[in-house]
């Protein structure tokens, strides 16, 4: 019986992990940018994917999308949000190695901002100015509060972007799987100890 307690504690140390993160599925650049815009406009900490941010590199839309949706999901999961984004994201227990240090399974304590990563094609410049990164002219501006004017983005096929309210997602961020794994290991350990007695 004295062996049972240490085995029980060890099983929790090695098997219980809340390291599930929300990442974007592979998609075209336009769809990834829409997901980034939604997440950043909805409260994700997107300062970290700005040019001076810790998670700017690698400078790819997929990387920026992973960081943005995970930040959004970690901040909103306690209110019932899921990692779905209309099918554009999924829960992963093994995040991409290029962004793993930027994907935390708990929300950051920073103030949410609505910055947008540079994709080489978009800019926040004033009307009629030139984008210094591409040399392309642009006539776009952001609203005065640096957030999209709507929290719902409409795709050309009239589907909406946003966390799904369905129960198909895992609102616990993978905790249920970890608890099941821990339970199985615990029961196996108890059975092994009982058979030796």
Curated annotation (Swiss-Prot):
Membrane association type: Lipid-anchor; GPI-anchor
GO cellular component terms given for this protein: nucleus; plasma membrane; plasmodesma; side of membrane
Proregion residues excised on maturation: 173-197
Residue stretches of biased makeup (Polar residues): 116-125, 146-155
Upregulating conditions: Regulated by the transcription factors NAC045 and NAC086.
Signal peptide annotation: 1-19
Key words of the record: Cell membrane, Glycoprotein, GPI-anchor, Lipoprotein, Membrane, Signal
Expression sites by tissue: Expressed in the sieve elements.
Annotated protein name in UniProt: Carbohydrate-binding X8 domain-containing protein
Organism whose genome encodes this protein: Arabidopsis thaliana
């Amino acid at each position: 019986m004295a062996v049972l307690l240490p085995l029980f504690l060890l099983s929790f140390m090695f098997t219980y992990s809340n390291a599930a993160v929300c990442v974007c599925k592979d998609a075209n650049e336009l769809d990834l940018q829409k997901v980034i815009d939604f997440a950043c406009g909805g409260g994700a900490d997107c300062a970290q994917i700005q040019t001076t941010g810790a998670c700017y590199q690698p400078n790819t839309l997929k990387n920026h999308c992973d960081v943005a949706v995970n930040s959004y999901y970690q901040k909103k999961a306690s209110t019932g949000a899921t990692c779905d984004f209309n099918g554009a994201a999924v829960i992963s227990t093994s995040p991409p190695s290029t962004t793993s240090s930027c994907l935390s399974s708990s929300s950051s304590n920073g103030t949410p901002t609505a910055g947008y990563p540079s994709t080489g094609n978009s800019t926040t410049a004033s009307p009629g100015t030139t984008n210094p990164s591409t040399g392309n002219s642009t006539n776009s501006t952001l609203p005065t509060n640096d957030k999209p004017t709507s929290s719902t983005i409409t795709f050309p096929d009239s589907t909406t972007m946003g966390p799904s309210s369905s129960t198909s997602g895992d609102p616990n961020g993978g905790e249920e799987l970890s608890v099941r794994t821990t339970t199985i290991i615990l029961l196996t350990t108890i059975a092994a100890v009982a058979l030796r007695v």
